Every structure is written in structure tokens, then in C-alpha cells.
């Protein structure tokens, strides 16, 4: 069995991190396992409870609470917190499994995520300039929130990523005899391949992972050029939601997979040995 190979194809960082990896010598099932682990098994911190003491704005309490619950919260070391179900307090609420914040504003003004005042120095909104609502003249909002660690398996708001996807690595299949016979001329809009009078004059192999012209190649070259998606190599795209770094999210997803496999291994050994 050949070892799995991974290389970073593209990385960009602005408000969030985006990366594309090429994963080879693997299967769609394994790559999909990583995708699902990123969505469901990586803990993040999110607002779970909202206690509204005063809200004079036209926005319903339920809508206000819903907006607060979807704000990504950034904490560099999520390991300092425990999932409520696993905490020593039994989920009743303590400094290990929850963080509190207060919000108190008077109008007229706009309310942003940065207006939440957390009682933990390491916790802050991933995007402080996120607009929550507007408070008009003689209006007031006073509330308290409780944020807890959770998994995307429980609710989508706890996902550390906004998008994860994969596809088979594109590979060109070229019938050179057919190209010459029909004297085909074609240039890919993405600049990946150029054919002049039946001759392939340019192929940008490095940009093949970006290829999106599967049907056009076949149509414009009368089937002489086709794109095949490999089933043992994949283009893996991931984008964070700002709540943690990309490398942290990926490593924690892999740790979660490893933990489940170790648990499965121990239980199978126990069953087989009859202990």
C-alpha cells in the first residue's frame, strides 16, 4: 500500500483562511471522512443562551437571540474549555465550560459584535464589525449571553468551517490522431490547454486542479480532448469561518478521526479476545 501524499496547492488569507490541497493515494471515502470531521467533530465556542432583560427595538427577542447565536467566536486555545457534557461540573456551568458576556446600549446607535463584553480575555468575536441590529431614539438593549463549546454534530453554528469540498483530480486524455485528422484549433478560457491546427502547443499541468471546462473540452474538440477525474487523487478545498486557524481546524479533525479509530480498535480487540 502506497503512503498517502498531501501537498498545498493554494492558500489565501484575508478575513478568513482558504486553502486547496492535493491529496493522492487515497479514496473518496477517506477524503469525505475528513470533510465530515471538519464539519461535525471540531469543537468551537458559540453563544447558546441569551438572557434579555430589556429590548425596546422593533426586532423580536427571538430574532435578536438567533443572530447572536450565529456570531463566530474566536479563541486561540479551544482546549482550555471542556464540552459541557464532559465537564466536571456536569454541564451546570463553570469557567471550564462556559463564557459570559454582557451587552448594554442606548439609542440612537448601531450594535456590533464588538459591543459584546466577554468575561474571558481570550474570547472575542471573529468579526467585530458584524452588525447585529440598530437601536433607535429612546430605545435600549440590555442582555447577557452564555457561550459554550460544542460540535457541528449538534448544531451547524458550531462548525469551524464555512465550506469544505472535494473533487477528483482532473487529468487530460488526448487523442492526438483525432486532433490532427480534424485539424482542431482550440484555446481553453482558463489558459490550461491550447491547440493550434491539430497540434497541442501548450498544457499548463500546474493549473489542472482548477479545471472547470470538462464538457467544453469534449464539445469543442469533437471528443479528442476529455477530462477524467481520478478516483485515487483529489482536490480538497476548505474555508474557515474565522473562529480558529485553518491548521488548528484540520489537525483537530484528524485527531477526532484518530480517536474514533483507536476506540473502535480497542473495542474490537476486546470483543475478539472475549475479555
UniProtKB/Swiss-Prot annotation:
Gene3D superfamilies reported in the protein's UniProt record: 3.30.70.20, DNA-directed RNA polymerase, insert domain, RNA polymerase, RBP11-like subunit
Top class in the EC scheme: transferase
EC identifiers of the protein: 2.7.7.6
Catalysed reactions, as listed in the record: RNA(n) + a ribonucleoside 5'-triphosphate = RNA(n+1) + diphosphate
Major localization listed first in the record, in broad terms: cytoplasm
GO molecular function: DNA binding; DNA-directed RNA polymerase activity; protein dimerization activity
GO cellular component: a single term: DNA-directed RNA polymerase complex
Keywords: Cytoplasm, DNA-directed RNA polymerase, Nucleotidyltransferase, Transcription, Transferase
Residues that span the membrane, as ranges: none
Protein location: Cytoplasm
One Gene Ontology biological process: DNA-templated transcription
Family: Belongs to the archaeal Rpo3/eukaryotic RPB3 RNA polymerase subunit family.
NCBIfam families per the UniProt record, alphabetical: PRK00783.1
Role noted for this protein: DNA-dependent RNA polymerase (RNAP) catalyzes the transcription of DNA into RNA using the four ribonucleoside triphosphates as substrates.
Description of how the protein assembles with itself and partners: Part of the RNA polymerase complex.
Protein name as catalogued: DNA-directed RNA polymerase subunit Rpo3
Native source organism of the sequence: Methanopyrus kandleri (strain AV19 / DSM 6324 / JCM 9639 / NBRC 100938)
